[in-house]
């Protein structure tokens, strides 16, 4: 039986990772792409989202919201790519992707010799991903280690068991993850990250902006990403992270989009609050 025949199709929260892959595949096709993800189309195809996908809603407001989510995925991907490159340039050689989904950075980015990249996720998405990687004959550009564990369980122990060393700096990435976790789970996750982080560690987070659940969740289709969002960012994300021992900067989507040459033409609908694109350093 082939990988394609054995492959378990995406469902639940992790199915949203295939939708993210579709967005990255579309960006990759652009002449002025902010990044290139050669594996994204294969992930989207395997998940049934390429070349076709669910049509945009008829309602104009709902259509704009869908396009906004796709745009935010492109900008956050570029933001975290840059953060990872900066961390590598500073000498960090351990990378942990929490809720890794269909992330292909181990395959599409250039890594310094000695880099170890840990992908933490549950078994189902990791197995799905592995079957696509075999099909594509993909070779990682660094030492890639998968860690099949639920983030509600003892993932630090599972990470240590495969060689993560908390005594040396790590760069942690939680991309498109925290918005799916209740606030107490977010606090526990951050406490666990902090406990495994030596001085000089880096962290990149994406947080749901204040009010995003109300704006996007009201008419979200069952099973859609927005229908599963449960938490938003604190009013003061920089202060929140300082309380956990991190020196952080927050950036808005609008700010980063302009910096990347993709300015948002429409004026903000409300007063700009602290942004949900977070970079942080462990002191």
UniProtKB/Swiss-Prot annotation:
Claim: Transferase is one of the keywords in the record: yes
Disulfide bonds: none
GO biological process, one term: methylation
Entry coiled-coil feature ranges: none
GO molecular function ontology, one term from the record: methyltransferase activity
UniProt entry keywords in alphabetical sequence: Methyltransferase, S-adenosyl-L-methionine, Transferase
Amino-acid positions noted as binding S-adenosyl-L-methionine in the UniProt annotation, renumbered to this chain: 121, 150-151
Region (Disordered): 258-283
Enzyme Commission code(s) on record: 2.1.1.-
UniProt xrefs under InterPro entries: Ppm1/Ppm2/Tcmp, SAM-dependent_MTases_sf, SAM_mthyl_Trfase_ML2640-like
Family recorded in the similarity comment: Belongs to the UPF0677 family.
Function: Exhibits S-adenosyl-L-methionine-dependent methyltransferase activity.
UniProt protein name: Putative S-adenosyl-L-methionine-dependent methyltransferase SAV_474/SAV474
């Amino acid at each position: 039986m082939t990988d394609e025949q054995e492959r378990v199709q995406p469902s639940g929260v992790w199915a949203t990772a295939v939708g993210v892959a579709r967005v990255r595949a579309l960006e990759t096709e652009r002449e002025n792409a902010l990044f290139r993800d050669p594996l994204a189309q294969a992930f989207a195809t395997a998940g049934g989202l390429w070349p076709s996908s669910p049509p945009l809603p008829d309602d104009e407001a709902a259509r704009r919201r869908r396009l906004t989510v796709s745009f935010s995925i492109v900008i956050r991907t570029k933001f975290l790519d840059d953060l990872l490159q900066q961390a590598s340039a500073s000498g960090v050689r351990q990378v942990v992707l929490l809720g890794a989904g269909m992330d292909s950075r181990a395959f599409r980015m250039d890594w310094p010799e000695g880099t170890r990249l840990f992908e933490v996720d549950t078994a189902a998405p990791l197995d799905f991903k592995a079957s696509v990687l075999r099909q594509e004959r993909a070779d990682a550009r660094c030492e890639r280690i998968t860690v099949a564990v639920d983030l509600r369980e003892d993932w630090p122990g599972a990470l240590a068991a495969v060689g993560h060393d908390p005594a040396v700096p790590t760069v942690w990435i939680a991309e498109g993850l925290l918005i799916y976790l209740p606030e107490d789970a977010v606090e526990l996750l951050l406490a666990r990250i902090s406990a495994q982080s030596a001085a000089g560690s880096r962290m990149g987070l994406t947080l749901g902006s204040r009010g995003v659940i109300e704006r996007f969740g009201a008419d979200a289709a069952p099973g859609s990403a927005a229908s599963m969002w449960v938490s938003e960012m604190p009013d003061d994300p920089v202060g929140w992270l300082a309380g956990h021992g991190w020196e952080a900067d927050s950036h808005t989507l609008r700010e980063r989009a302009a910096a990347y040459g993709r300015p948002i033409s429409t004026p903000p609908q409300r007063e700009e609050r602290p942004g949900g694109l977070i970079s942080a350093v462990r002191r």
